Amino acid sequence: MSEEQLKAFIAKVQADTSLQEQLKAEGADVVAIAKAAGFTITTEDLNSHRQNLTDDELEGVAGGTASGGCDTSMFCY
């Protein structure tokens, strides 16, 4: 997966409330959700690219705010 794929997935999530709700669910499988949305993302990809994402991208993935928290998959809420 390229950084562009990850950023494209994040952009899609930011614009799609259905994806946001799926990612907010307890135990959400980010890789499976991304795959269902047409993206090929692995857990390793998420972990290796996490440090390259801006705070705004991380916060916006699931409609989160800086006062929220991050789950183990890298997405903040």
UniProtKB/Swiss-Prot annotation:
Top-level division of the source organism's lineage: Bacteria
Residue(s) of cross-link: Lanthionine (Ser-Cys): 67-70
Swiss-Prot/TrEMBL keywords: Secreted, Thioether bond
Keyword Secreted: yes
UniProt KW 4Fe-4S keyword: no
Protein name (record): Lantipeptide prochlorosin 4.3
Localisation per UniProt entry: Secreted
Signal sequence region: none
Residue runs in coiled coils: none
GO cellular component, one term: extracellular region
Propeptide cleavage-removed residue intervals: 1-64
Record's function text: Lanthionine-containing peptide (lantipeptide) with unknown function. Does not show antibiotic activity against Lactococcus lactis 117 and Bacillus subtilis 6633 bacteria. Organisms that produce this peptide live in oligotrophic environments at very dilute concentrations, suggesting this peptide is not secreted to influence other bacteria.
2,3-didehydrobutyrine modified-residue sites: 65
Record InterPro entries: CHP03798_Ocin, Nif11
Induction info: Down-regulated under nitrogen starvation.
NCBIfam families, per the entry: leader_Nif11
Modification after translation (UniProt): Cross-links are proved in vitro, when coepressed in E.coli with the ProcM lanthionine synthetase. The lanthionine residue has both a DL configuration (with 2S,6R stereochemistry) and a LL configuration (with 2R,6R stereochemistry). DL and LL diastomers have a 4:1 ratio. It is unknown whether nonenzymatic cyclization occur, but authors favor a model in which ProcM does generate all thioether cross-links. The beta-methyllanthionine residue has a DL configuration (with 2S,3S,6R stereochemistry).
Entries under Pfam families matching the protein: Nif11 (PF07862)
Cross-linked sites for Beta-methyllanthionine (Thr-Cys): 72-76
